[in-house]
Amino acid sequence: SGYAPKAVKEIQGHDEMAWRKLAQLITALENEKADQKMVEAVRKESLNHKVPVLGITGTGGAGKSSLTDELVRRIRLDQGDALRIAVISIDPSRRKSGGALLGDRIRMNAISPWSSGQRVFMRSLATRDFGSEISAALPDVLAATKCAGFDLIIVETSGIGQGDAAIVPH
């Protein structure tokens, strides 16, 4: 992709430009258009970043987005809004267009900037035709998000069936 970053250092940091570059890289990963050297660099660099990944899964309508929002809110309150949190929300793809429904963002109130500035990065991923409740790009997206320097990564699956255990290895 023409806009995707070419070096890991471009996605590191917590300013708007670094987050924009991270979002562009995620888009390139999702569309399988990321520079292969960059993908390898991200995979290698991510091994140096031990970031907890919390997977939230369940059936449709179980309250995954509400739970995610409440967890983010409480973490921000309990930690004095000091932690940087990434939320990766995996949405089912529409069969016609292949795009994500993006319904989760409607329920997310705690992701907006508070007095200490932007602390929560949220990105939706489409399942595409992967045949799972997670995106095929998820492992590389998690690697990129770890490289970006977040303190916690929350992954919310699409929850479309009983195969939600696919999040466990991540």
Model-derived features: positions:
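Extreme N-terminal, non-catalytic leader segments
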Residues: S1-V53
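Nucleotide-state-sensitive switch-loop elements of NTP-binding domains
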Residues: L29-V51, A62, L71-I167
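Hydrophobic positions on the alpha1 helix immediately C-terminal to the Walker A/P-loop
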Residues: L67
